[in-house]
């Protein structure tokens, strides 16, 4: 299973942003390489397809709203850490995003081919996918780290990566 001494951070605020990552699980992979799994948690039970890239409709705050697809959201959090967290860059920490919609029973819309590009970067798991979610976590985290990777990420300096700076 998932190691008992795996690091866990709940509602982690990405420094110098208003973004919060619902769940981060840390450890190392089979090659002892530091890794983190980002899990975007959604309570949604239903979503509707839109023609817009990375956008779904769901019932939120008393009405139907257009919101980011959770896979896209999880991937953007991973990209923020990869692009601006010095420790993630220098220690080459692997960031593996996914989304878990624990109340959703029908996957037709959330896993629709319209969102394929985002699902490939960060898979979405629904209520019946708990075993697949566990397998995803175990695939990336074979050994626990007693929170060491999360501690390193949290105390890291924030600066643009060379890759990002080269693009600008």
Put a short name on every predicted segment.
Residues 1-156:
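Accessory nucleic-acid engagement/destabilization modules that flank
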